[in-house]
């Protein structure tokens, strides 16, 4: 059993897991999910910060029982001959365990290990939870002698799990910030969200087809600077992209060439208006994944008339795109699309596109 600590948008992270592992995912409190599988690569997930293998399940456990389990197990591990110096971090989620109590557990592991002839380095806690950056930079879960102990409680159940890795925020930042072409005006879709969208769509497609896809074919019809296509390429997908703006087509081509380290990689990127374009390969697609037109950017809440104008324009463009592509893709093609919404802080509401309520009339379920 694998425990996943969900990210800043836990509902999206949960949906991603449910798409990839249908019937095997159980929500565990507000911050985590349990996946009934033997192994998992955290780097293939966008919506989970950490992954850990469940070691102990306790019920109605007090801090003394939790502490004893951890101290006894990891003090003995420190004297294993096949391991060099043991590095341990401890995180407690929803566990009503204070930072001072975590520090006491760490100190006890270190003291007992020393008595047994072993050495342990304990990563200091400023809070009950070690942040993802700390886990990643200390390589916790990536080596047998570098572990993060995760304690998490939900209702009467306490899980003690041992990390198998944290999200590689260094690689994600590099793909986001050092690619040659970026454009804040057309949107800055984070690689983590792009990866989540890819997994949601491909997971759904695999469920529909009832088979694992070794090289899924995906299209981003609003490709922008190519973030979704980058993440799809890294997962072995055959990528196609179009954009109304020739500048964005060029940006995507340059970014993919940078990612692949090859100008010779065969790109299927071209200019095209998503509301009327014909994709000759559409029937071969496994998924359509995109961040659609987001409308005019605002620095502050627009007046109601302006907002309705922008909302209507976006609704029209996206509806026409959905109608256009529906006539070209096969019935087993999955779609995952991001569309705009506008938060009005003055009246504490979110304005959404009308098409959401009428998606079935566009031919989708």
Residue ranges: model-predicted function:
Residues 1-72, 76, 94-108, 134-148, ...:
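Class I S-adenosyl-L-methionine-dependent methyltransferase catalytic core
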